[in-house]
Amino acid sequence: MPFCWILYLCKMKNIDYIAITDHDNIAGAIAFREYCKRKKASLNVIIGEEIMTVDGEIIGLYMTRDIPGGLTASETIGLLKEQGAVIYIPHPYDIRRKKTVLKESIICEYVDDIHCIECWNGRNSHISYGLQQEKIAQKYNIKSVVGADAHTFWEFGKNVMYFPKEPVNANAFINGLDEAIMSKGKIRNIVHFITKIDRLLKIMISGDFNEVRRIIIKKINNRKFRVSKNNR
């Protein structure tokens, strides 16, 4: 999404802080922060990253340097601790994204290092996902957060948190979680379809038609498998 849209939507929705958590890099977050500075915007940008470990996804907030994907959860958590980042577990339960969900055994093992865990993700495709996510947070007594996971313009401002004091740094964020108010938006499954179309268009524009062909064939084969399975 263009930076100008993100900034405009944050102004329209009265968002004071936004965490940018691109996959496996902080370059986008840093670039957006610099863009906001050039525009002399009052929006505060939290530098973050959604890191794909071999054990599932972990988010870091208030980061100062990249952490590559493909490491173990242990290595990733260690690197996040070195830079004083908030260690945040996204969507701890999600059938649609089960390949990216951090293993519960890892949550159990590193419970003392994890600062917060989502009890609701803005891209949940069913209400039951949120209930399961909340159960996991309660089971391990980890502070709960709401994750916007916004990729499209109408997702902005639907899932937000209101802090008693400004989360100016990692410590302020962690200390404010107990009194933070969570606002959960409605489920909108159409956003998943829009994201897939957007991704396909970007690949087509780049000229990588072999990748387009691979995605279409995979989709057709998956549908055939589901039909075959249902007909048994």
Where are these regions (language model features)?
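Histidine-centered divalent metal-coordination motifs
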Residues: 23, 91, 151
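General beta-strand structural signal in soluble alpha/beta enzymes
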Residues: 19, 45-47, 88-90, 144-146
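Short glycine/serine/threonine/alanine-rich loop segments
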Residues: 15, 41-43, 85, 142
